[in-house]
Each structure stands twice: as C-alpha cells, then as structure tokens.
C-alpha cells in the first residue's frame, strides 16, 4: 500500500489517503504503524499530513448492551448498594473493586449504553452516577443481570480453610422460609489461588454432612457480601432459569426484604 500511495501522490501531486473497511483493531493498528493515511467513517480517521489522528470507536462497538459483563455487574452493584446518591469517581470504584483501567472503562461504557448511568467530568477525572433512584435503577437493570456462577464443585468439608460465603439454597434458606439443602453451599471467586488446589469429589460417594458445594463466581463475592452471605441481588441471579416453585417463592421473599431495606 505504501508503494501505491507513493505512485498516487506523484501522479496527483498531493497527499492521498485510503478509504478502508476495518474489520478489526489489528488491521487499524497495522495501518497506523506503517504510516498509511486512511479514513473509515464514522470514527476512525488517520490523516497525519493534516495533523488529524483517528478516534477510536472500537470500544463502543465491542461493548454490547444485551447482558452485563462480570465487571459491569460489579460496578452496577457498587452503585446500587452505596448509600450516597451523589456521583463517585470512576477511579475510586476501580480501586475498590480491583478493576483494571480497561475493565472499568468497558464496564461504565456498557452501563451507560444500557441507560443506567451517566459519566461526567469532575476536575481532571471522570465521575459516574446512577440515572435513577435506587429502586428504578434495579428494576431497569434486571433484564441485563447475569448469573455470577461459573461452575459448582463439591469438596470435603475439611478442605474449607479459606474464606467463603454462604450461597445458593443455603443462603436463600437464611433469608426465607426455604429449608436448607442437604449439602451446604458456599461461594468464592474463581480466580482464587486455592481453587487449583481443591480436590473435587463425587457427593454421591460421600456422607453429605462431610461435603461442601463450592460455587466458583465470575466476580469476587467478597466485595458485596454481608454477614457471611453473598449479596441478595447476586444471590437471586444465581437461580436464573430455575423453575422450582419453592425457589421462586423464596427469591420473591428475599427481594421483598431487600427492597424494604434498600428502597
């Protein structure tokens, strides 16, 4: 392309640029690295001879507003549970939830695309704020929420020397009239180092009293856990797709209590 560009410029006696269809970020980066001017409307423009640099629209294209990413749900929950109705610095949320700059940027972009938050300048930083009261914020987000459970494993109870939180039917039974399950259920983050060291067993071959079911979560439940239990909104999400009438009634009871406390 550089040789062709030189021929065109010699023939036309002026700088030239290519109109391209960028299929991915790598293609765009390769053109920039090679110094080849290009235009890919509406947002990617690289005309160095005019002092114009491209505007990256890939972030918005890659952020879909159908279901929350794990990091997005973390930011959503942080804004839901915080007592302050005012805005909060995006950097503060990222630090509190241990999110990278890329993760917090994509998470807030997705929440903004869903119409749940707004972003605004605050000095030299960016602040974020809910677009609704806490109740409306939750109601408008329900369709986007994901099940945080990546996988469920069973281990022997004596292995549970790590921090974990009451989850699943165990936690639900503590918040409703549901009877507790035969095997206790608890949750940890799937990225914890201890996960690779756990020995998975077949509960059918063991005494249920000696076993624990461990939910491996896509985000760290410790950030929102209270009184040793996973947070109520995340707990309800772990039962997505469960059509057991007992569970459905207990979740409604759980959420009613949550609404009374939060809203």
Model-derived features: positions:
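Minor-groove-contacting beta-hairpin "wing" of winged helix-turn-helix DNA-binding domains
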Residues: 123-132
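Short alpha-helical segments that sit at the start of domains
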Residues: 49-77
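A short, conserved structural fragment
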Residues: 112-123
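Short amphipathic alpha-helical interaction segments
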Residues: 98-113
């Amino acid at each position: 392309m550089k040789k062709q560009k030189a021929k065109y410029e010699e023939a036309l006696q002026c700088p030239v640029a290519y109109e391209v269809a960028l299929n991915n970020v790598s293609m765009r980066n390769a053109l920039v690295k090679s110094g080849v001017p290009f235009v890919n409307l509406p947002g990617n423009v690289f005309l160095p001879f005019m002092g114009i640099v491209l505007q990256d629209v890939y972030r918005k294209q890659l952020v879909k507003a159908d279901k929350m990413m794990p990091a997005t749900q973390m930011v959503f929950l942080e804004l839901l549970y915080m007592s302050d109705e005012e805005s909060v610095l995006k950097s503060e949320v990222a630090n509190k939830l241990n999110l990278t700059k890329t993760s917090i940027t994509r998470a807030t972009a997705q929440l903004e695309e869903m119409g749940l938050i707004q972003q605004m300048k605050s000095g030299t930083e960016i602040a974020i704020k809910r677009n609704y009261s806490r109740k409306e914020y939750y109601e408008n987000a329900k369709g986007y929420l994901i099940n945080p459970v990546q996988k469920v494993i069973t281990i022997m109870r004596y292995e549970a020397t790590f921090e974990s939180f009451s989850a699943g039917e165990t936690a639900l039974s503590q918040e409703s009239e549901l009877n507790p399950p035969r095997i206790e259920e608890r949750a940890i983050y799937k990225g914890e180092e201890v996960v690779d060291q756990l020995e998975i067993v077949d509960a059918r071959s063991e005494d249920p009293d000696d076993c624990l079911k461990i939910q491996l979560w896509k985000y760290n439940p410790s950030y929102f856990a209270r009184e040793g239990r996973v947070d109520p909104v995340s707990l309800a999400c772990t039962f997505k797709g469960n059509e057991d009438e007992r569970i459905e009634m207990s979740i409604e009871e759980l959420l009613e209590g949550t609404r009374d406390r939060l809203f």
